[in-house]
Structures are given as structure tokens and as C-alpha cells.
Amino acid sequence: MATTTPNYGWPVPTSTDYVKDGATAIEALGDAIDATVFGLPSAGLTLVKTQTIGSAVSSVTVTSAFSATYDAYKIIISGGASSSNTCVLQMTLGSTATGYRAAIWEVNYTAGSAVTGQNNTAFWNFGLGVPEGLSAIGDISLPFASDQTTFSSTAVAMGLAGGNMLTRWMNGFLGDTTSYTAFTITPSAGTLTGGTIKVYGYKA
């Protein structure tokens, strides 16, 4: 007599079932698995692109990052190093070099905190870089759609002189209706070596 699996209740034959009923048993099991998998939640992150940063580069362009498949993306920059003691990792979408706006909250563990802004600049402040590593974790919404693009990111500069640490939170938008597929990361000073840029798409 057929039994069922303990977790999903899929029908499976037992060792005493007739061999002649094997095809029917496999069909029933396949239908049950298909129904379960089809009903599983689809939300989550899917890796879209991994871009390795070269040696002593002045910018990194990530192509085929955005498409109609996803409305929102997570971008993570990690590893590697900056030749500058502290640099800002600036982001531009496509070839657009104007219209970027953002609010920036910065905490320096020895110098206190500050709030600044970007109004119609040539880039977003997206992350930070120091010789000890590159840092940025951010979300971008609607870069491919013909709508304004918004972003939110955080970054930490580790190992600054005297054991100091710098943290930034950045939020902003680009108020055009251009559809973008690529973005570029440029250090505000010096060059970048090593590390990766990973782009994930948010499933609906």
C-alpha cells in the first residue's frame, strides 16, 4: 500500500506494492512535487552579475546589470583596496552626468557626525574605499524602467589612522526617465585594485 513522505505528504510506493503499478506511482509522485514547487514563494534575491575589479583602475563599469526582469536591485561592493587613504565610491547610471540628488548622514567616530546633501550633481555618493578595503551595500529601484530611479546605501571605512572608523548612510534619486542597463563606480581619489561588485535582482 502506498504511503506518503513525512514533510510534504507526497505519495510514494512501499516495498510491498506491485511493480506493475510503478508507472502510476511515479506519475502521482511527479504531480504532487510539481504542485508543491509551483506553490512555493518566489520572493528572494537572484545573482545577476559579478564584476571583478581590476588592478589600479580609475573606474569600473558594470554592464548588463539592469533589465526588465527585475524592478529593484541590491548592489554589494566588497574586498579590494583603494590607493587613497579615504575615497568616496561615486556611482553614475549609463552616461548620465547630471541630476543626481541625495542626502548623506556621516558618523566619524573621532570627529562626530554631519549631514550633507547632493543637489544636481554628476554622480551619487554610493560607498567608501580605504587601503583596507572597499565598502558599499545598497538598493536601487527602477533603473531600467522609464521612471525616476531611487537608491539607498550604507558604507563603512575601516582601519583609518588611529583606529578611527567612518560610516555613511546615503539616500537619493535621479529624476529622469531614461532606461539604464549599466552603471559605473569611480573613486573620488586614487585608484581601485581588486574586490568585487555583485548585483542581485529582487524577485517580486
What are these regions (language model features)?
Residues 26:
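Charged, flexible cofactor/metal-binding loops and thiol motifs
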Residues 3-13:
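Short, contiguous pre-domain boundary segments
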Residues 2-4, 17, 21, 30-204:
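Surface-exposed molecular-recognition determinants
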